[in-house]
Amino acid sequence: MISVTELRNGTKVEMDGGLWECLEYSHLKMGRGGAKVVTKFRNMETGSIVDRTFNSGEKLQDIYVEGKKMQYLYRDGDDYVFMDMETFDQVHLPPALVGDTAKFMKENTEVEVAMYGDKALSITLPNQVILKIVQTDPGVRGDTVSGGTKPATLETGAVVQVPLFVEQGTDVKVDTRTGQYLSRA
């Protein structure tokens, strides 16, 4: 158990029958009466966000979330299949859990899966991945008045803005947090 005054960004707790991650917190001192802690929590299973206010003496049940290294193998129907890098067990995860990370995952990509017991909560990609451009228009010489970018479709289906000199078939580095082109690989 932890006191609500010990909450920090990223603290994971169990409350109201669900698993929650603290996104924001602030400690308010009142003129009369006790202090209050105003928080914003994200449900780790559904993704919903809730604002909660606690009295300073309240306690919450903290949880331990383990990060497991896994490798993305393939898609099986709607599910994504990952392999645990330690035990080599295969785990099927639904598209709702994988979410937008699928845009930058190709086969054999290593990811970190946040696990609580046997339940997968979220997937974290490496900060940068190298992907091949499968479709982009050729850059036109002299068309660089505004800095010059064009859309390019990656091998995973994601579309990123790349400089005009980048051609189809080129391997590029992409930041998975922002979805932006970084450099040629």
Swiss-Prot record:
Keywords attached to this entry = Cytoplasm, Elongation factor, Protein biosynthesis
Q: Name one GO molecular function term.
A: translation elongation factor activity
Intracellular or extracellular location(s): Cytoplasm
Q: Which CDD domains does this one have?
A: S1_EF-P_repeat_1 (cd04470), S1_EF-P_repeat_2 (cd05794)
The record's function comment reads: Involved in peptide bond synthesis. Stimulates efficient translation and peptide-bond synthesis on native or reconstituted 70S ribosomes in vitro. Probably functions indirectly by altering the affinity of the ribosome for aminoacyl-tRNA, thus increasing their reactivity as acceptors for peptidyl transferase.
The UniProt similarity line reads: Belongs to the elongation factor P family.
**Name this polypeptide is given:** Elongation factor P
